[in-house]
Amino acid sequence: MFGGAKGGHFGVPPAGCSGAVSQAAAGTKAGPAGGRPADTMWRLRCKAKGGTHVLQGLSNRTRLRELQGQIAAITGIAPGSQRILVGYPPECLDLSDRDITLGDLPIQSGDMLIVEEDQTRPKASPAFSKHGAPSYVRETLPVLTRTAVPADNSCLFTSVYYVVEGGVLNPACAPEMRRLIAQIVASDPDLYSEAILGKTNEEYCDWIRRDDTWGGAIEISILSKFYQCEICVVDTQTVRIDRFGEDAGYTKRVLLIYDGIHYDPLQRNFPDPDTPPLTIFSSNDDIVLVQALELADEARRKRQFTDVNRFTLRCMLCQKGLTGQAEARDHARETGHTNFGEV
């Protein structure tokens, strides 16, 4: 997870939302908590056949299985087929104990890891998607999946909280996140003018605090700045990724998927059940963007999206016919149903 400011990650408490969000100033950069050596983030480089990559979000407490999962996602070499060499002359790491921590291996922050495929082990059969990313059998490589959050008008806020907190589903934090956004907007009326907001600054602040309003691009851009991370939203209708905070130099990125009226968080799941899902990625991890596009393309081909400008659709849960954005919004609000298909 991200290193937190006072009161929790980036000022958001892990549960309950007892007000810690509003204590952090808008745009305040949250640094690593504490500063103990055990929590210091490592920066490792990984050199493989496809080039050199930076591995981030690791520490001396990270387990070997997590390191191998990142390497697999970047290189396409399954953990069981990896050979990792370090030092000069390069020597192979002992990968037999996947629960060992990096601090107990002969590597340190700043090292270059040379990754090769072990030719003595059975190879997974690779296939290349139309986006060009290598994919192996699903049992050996981590995959990107969506996690459903409640359709309660606050799916954007719940989804953002989920990914920045490393997989914590807590819809109760939505009101506090709404108040946070209102506080940030109210603090800078010149930046957040009527021309930007579509309503006066004061009207917007009252509007966003309501629990029946939906968040969108403005709110995502504010949260990107507050959490100091790139927020990538992949659209299932256009199979396009909108990257908020892309040019801000953030080192982390999180991902959401959007179908026209509903947001869900994305996470990377690993084959090993003991390895927790990953929701926070390095901003250098372009493999995860390719995986997100593939997920969106699959949803588009199944017509799991909502054209908000012109559509006739049917609720896939109750089969009710709907026309237009307003009817879809009302139906989702009244029933909690968000799985729509175009007719």
Curated annotation (Swiss-Prot):
Renumbered residue ranges of the record's region His-loop: 258-262
Main location: cytoplasm
Binding site for substrate: I261
Active-site annotation: D152, C155 (nucleophile), H262, H337
All residue ranges annotated as the OTU domain in the record: 144-269
GO molecular function list: cysteine-type deubiquitinase activity; K48-linked deubiquitinase activity; ubiquitin protein ligase binding; zinc ion binding
Region of interest: S2 site: 286-291
Residue ranges crossing the lipid bilayer per the database entry: none
Enzyme nomenclature, EC number: 3.4.19.12
Name of a matching Pfam family: OTU1_UBXL
Coiled coil: none
Span list, region Cys-loop: 149-155
Subunit comment: Interacts with VCP; the interaction is direct. Interacts with FAF2/UBXD8. Interacts with DERL1; however interaction is dependent on the UBAX-like region, suggesting that it may be indirect. Interacts with PLAA, UBXN6 and VCP; may form a complex involved in macroautophagy.
Function field: Hydrolase that can remove conjugated ubiquitin from proteins and participates in endoplasmic reticulum-associated degradation (ERAD) for misfolded lumenal proteins. May act by triming the ubiquitin chain on the associated substrate to facilitate their threading through the VCP/p97 pore. Ubiquitin moieties on substrates may present a steric impediment to the threading process when the substrate is transferred to the VCP pore and threaded through VCP's axial channel. Mediates deubiquitination of 'Lys-27'-, 'Lys-29'- and 'Lys-33'-linked polyubiquitin chains.
Name of the featured protein: Ubiquitin thioesterase OTU1
Organism: Rattus norvegicus (Rat)
GN (gene name): Yod1
